[in-house]
Amino acid sequence: MDRAEAFEAALKLAPGKTALVVVDMQRAFLDPGEAMEVPPARDIVSQIHTLLDLFREKRLPVVFTEFTYSEDVPVLAGLLHPEHRRAAPGAPRGFGRPSSSCLRGEANVHVVPELASQPGELVVTKHYYDGFNGTALDSALRARGVTHLVLTGTMTDICVLATAVGGMNREYRMTVVEDGTATLWPEIQRATLDIIRRAYGRVLTARQIADEIGRW
């Protein structure tokens, strides 16, 4: 059995035990003109929406994460990325400047309206790249009997990758959506997906995942 066959055998999605995780599809990353705008993330909204519809139809768990910077929890990300720090009134905003990006209490901290959560769906506020670190995500998934995760969202090389690694280290079977994740640079997108394929999980298209789940 080669590596691809081993991954497929171990990680194939399981009926009733699979959840969709939408990572950081927030206005701070998708709204035009935001300091931390990721334009390619707007191109994956339709694929994520299709998967949301499918998971909801199948009554499978759906989870959203929102990266939130708080002045009460001044984590290292705020030092590495000044855009998260509060913008002074009237001061120019933009890349490399304090811009209140993903700052608690700001409108841009929330998931874009097109992908809004529905009642009963879990919205996880996180202060680190990894959606499991310092949150109740692991406990919430285990309480729902989840063992397999389908990851979508942005940025592929930062929060999606960190969450994939965090999930795998907690024994979750990870599948990352190739055309349902995005980052700023196509070469980094490809390289990150290759890293995931090599060690952390499967990488499939939204159509492949829909076909797999549609047979249940």
Tell where the protein language model's regions lie, with residue ranges.
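Short, hinge-like loop/turn segments at secondary-structure boundaries
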Residues: 79-83, 168-169, 192-195
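Internal catalytic-core helix/loop-beta-alpha segment
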Residues: 101-150
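Short acidic-hydrophobic, aromatic-tinged amphipathic segments that line or gate anion-handling sites
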Residues: 124, 202-209
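Short glycine/serine/threonine-rich phosphate/pyrophosphate-binding segments
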Residues: 156-163
